C-alpha cells in the first residue's frame, strides 16, 4: 500500500499538479455560489448526501486537477458519461453506474457530458465503523480502493429510491438518526452485491 501511495504522489508531482484535498464542506462552498439550496449537499454529523442533481462536476471540481477525497464515497451516475482518473487508472463511465471511492482516493475529472447527473454520499470512516462494528461488508473492508459498477435500470431505481429516502429523512424537522443509519446500511449492502 505504501508503494502505491508513494508512486501516486510521485506520478502527480511529475505531472506538476498539486493534489488538493476536496472536502464536502469545500464542495458545498463552491456550489453555494451558483446553485440553489435544494441542490447543495446535506451535511449531518458523520455523513453527507448529495441529492440527484444536474451536472455539478464542473462547478465543484476543476478539470485536470487531482483531488484527494477524504471519507468513504458511494455514488450513482444517473445520466450522461464521465471520463475520470482514479488512483492512476483512467475510466470511461456511462450511466447508470455505481461508484465507490475509499477514503484517501485520488480523483481527477477529465471530461463530463452536458447531461451528466449524479447523486451520492460521503461517509466518515469513524461513522462507518459505528454502522458496522463487527461485520463490514467485504467491499468496504479497506482492500478495494475504488470501483465502477454498471447496473441495470432496476438496480438504478433501487439505489435512487434509497438516496431519495435518505434525503427526505435528513430534511425532516426532527432528524431520525436510526432511520438514516438503516438506509445507509441498506445502500452499503446493495453496493456490496
Tell what function each PLM region has.
Residues 157-193:
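An amphipathic alpha-helical interaction segment
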Residues 88-100:
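Short acidic-glycine-tyrosine-enriched beta hairpin
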Residues 77-79, 94, 102, 112:
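A short, compositionally biased micro-patch
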Residues 74, 98-100, 120-122:
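Conserved hydrophobic/aromatic beta-strand scaffold that supports enzyme active sites
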Residues 83-85, 101, 107-112:
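Short beta-strand His + acidic residue motifs that chelate non-heme Fe in jelly-roll/DSBH
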Residues 7, 14-19, 34-37, 109-171:
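A hydrophobic/aromatic-rich effector-binding and dimerization subdomain
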Residues 1-82, 91:
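Generic protein-terminus/edge-of-domain signal
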Amino acid at each position: 500500500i505504501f508503494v502505491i501511495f508513494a508512486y501516486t504522489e510521485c506520478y502527480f508531482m511529475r505531472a506538476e499538479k498539486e493534489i488538493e484535498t476536496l472536502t464536502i464542506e469545500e464542495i458545498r462552498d463552491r456550489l453555494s455560489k451558483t446553485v440553489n439550496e435544494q441542490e447543495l449537499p446535506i451535511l449531518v454529523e458523520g455523513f453527507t448526501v448529495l441529492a440527484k442533481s444536474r451536472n455539478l462536476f464542473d462547478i465543484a471540481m476543476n478539470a485536470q486537477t487531482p483531488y484527494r477525497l477524504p471519507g468513504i464515497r458511494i455514488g450513482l451516475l444517473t445520466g450522461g458519461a464521465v471520463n475520470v482518473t482514479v488512483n492512476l487508472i483512467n475510466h470511461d463511465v456511462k450511466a447508470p453506474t455505481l461508484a465507490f471511492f475509499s477514503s484517501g482516493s485520488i480523483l481527477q475529472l477529465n471530461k463530463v457530458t452536458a447531461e451528466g447527473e449524479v447523486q451520492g454520499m460521503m461517509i466518515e470512516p469513524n461513522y462507518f465503523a459505528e454502522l458496522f462494528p463487527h461485520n463490514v461488508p467485504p467491499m468496504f473492508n479497506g482492500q478495494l480502493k475504488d470501483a465502477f459498477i454498471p447496473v441495470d435500470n432496476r438496480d438504478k431505481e433501487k439505489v435512487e429510491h434509497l438516496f431519495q429516502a435518505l434525503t427526505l429523512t435528513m430534511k425532516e424537522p426532527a432528524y431520525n438518526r436510526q432511520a438514516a443509519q438503516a438506509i445507509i446500511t441498506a445502500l452499503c449492502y446493495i453496493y456490496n452485491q
